[in-house]
Structures are given as C-alpha cells and as structure tokens.
Amino acid sequence: MSYEPIWGAIIAWYLFLAGLGGGAFATAVFVRYRHPDCKRLMRVGRLIAPIVVIIGLCLLMFDATAGFHNPLRFVLLLTNFGSVMTWGVVFLAVFVVVALIVLVLDLMKREVPMWLDCVGLVMGLCVAIYTGCLLGVCQGFPLWNSALLPILFLVSAVSTGMAAVLLVGVFYAPDEFNEVVVMKKFHFWLPVIEFVLVAALLFITAFNPSPAGWESVMSLVSGNWAVAFWLLFVIVGLVLPTILECWMLWLAKHEFETSRTGQMISALSDAGVLVGGFMLRLLIVSAAVPITIIQPWML
C-alpha cells in the first residue's frame, strides 16, 4: 500500500536550513572560543546563520497556504505554549534577532559580548532540537515518534553547520581554514555519531508494534527510497566525508593537507555532509508510513 506524504520537500528544506543555521552559529562560537584569531571564519558562521534560517522560514510560510487563508491561525500559534510549534516560533524568533545583532556588530567591527554569543548558541541548539521535536510529536508515524530524532537532528545540524562554514571558508579564508585543526577533528566524528544514531533509529522503528514502523524502514533500505538512502545519504553524506577527512587529518602529510589540492578534497567532504544533511531530512519526512487503524465495519 502506498501513502501520500503529508509533508514534502519544502518542509525538508525548512528543517535542513533551520538546523544548519543553528549549527553555523554554534560553529562561530566554537571558532571564537578555540580559534579566536580566525576572525574571517568566525564571520562566515555569523553570516550564514541568520540568512539560511530566514530563507527556511520564508519557505515554510509559502508552504503553509492554510495560514494565508486564515491568518488567525498564526496568531493563535503564538499563544499555545503547550505546543511544540509555539516554542519553535519562540526559539526561531529569538535566534534570528540575536544572530542579526551579532552579525551587525561583527560587520561594524565591534566586539560581540560573550553573553550575546551564549544566548545565540543556546537558541541555535534549541532550534536544531526543535526541528526533530516537530516531527516527534506526530505519534501516528513510528519513524518520527522517537526520542532519538531530536538528538539525531541536533548532531546533524552541528555537522552541517560546521560543513557550511568550512566549505565557504576554504574559498573566503583559506589560510584560516588550515588553522582550525581542532574543529576539523571534532567535525570528523559527527557523521560517525550520526550513522550510529540513524542505525539505532531504524532498528527501533523496525520493531515498533505497528507494521507501519517496519514498512517505513523497508521503504528506506530496500523500497522506493533505497537508492537515495544508500547512495546520497549513506555513501555521499556519511561514508565519503568520513574517508576523505580520515585521509586528510591522519594519513596525509601536513604539506599536502594544507595545499590547495588538500583543501579542495576537504571541501568535497564538506559538500557531501551538506548533501547528506538534506537527504536525511527529506528521507525521514517522505518515507514515514502512518499507523493504519482498521475499524470492524471496514473488514
């Protein structure tokens, strides 16, 4: 039996961009703390963060056609603090405001208060977690209704945020790109953790009491979404970046790692992480099968 997904690619883009924005801001804070001399790389993270989140919000607004027909629904969304979506709006609003203030201060070459960076960091991580919780509250979909999903989306958000900053940085600030070795080593482990979390999520979902859980997993690993899952997510998004970064960080000579060729190999790895981050969300949104309740009169 086939099912029409209740959400599509636009929602996947929103979830991806919102998480990436939070991860990019967290990366900028990481650079400030661990590599304070890399000002240009720090600016890249501060620039990416608000822009991609705002783009994601615009996509969400265009997709939410019902809200345009009934604007009161958006107003009510701000008053229902028992709703995950309400808290998501709060996190997003605070994050965008803080990220824009930080960006303006940076562009004006003024010192950004540490407390402001901390607020932005917390809100950015909350946004990343919220993107997983938004799906997780849908109890009728075993693939979504898991406590692992917010953790998975958080790890993926930080991974894609760092990848975006490094990918832009390799062209905008190549000298600083070679200096952030600690961040690169931290980033190396994120796709590995992501792989473990995805495997755990699929294992738990497959053994859900409802057949919908098994059908969702089979749709990913051997069904309609299998090619995208194995090729674009697993190979391009996880395996390729892990192999390339392992080569660059631990096997290649330092002269090659810091050469332009080495930088381009790292850039390819970061591009793969971004592809995998988007595919993760698209696959989870699209492959989820709802629980079907059959009434006696339907038999």
Language-model features, listed with the residues they occupy:
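Long, contiguous internal "core" modules enriched in hydrophobic/ aromatic residues
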Residues: G8, L15-L17, H35-D37, R43, ...
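Membrane helical hairpin/interfacial module
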Residues: A18-F91, F95-V98
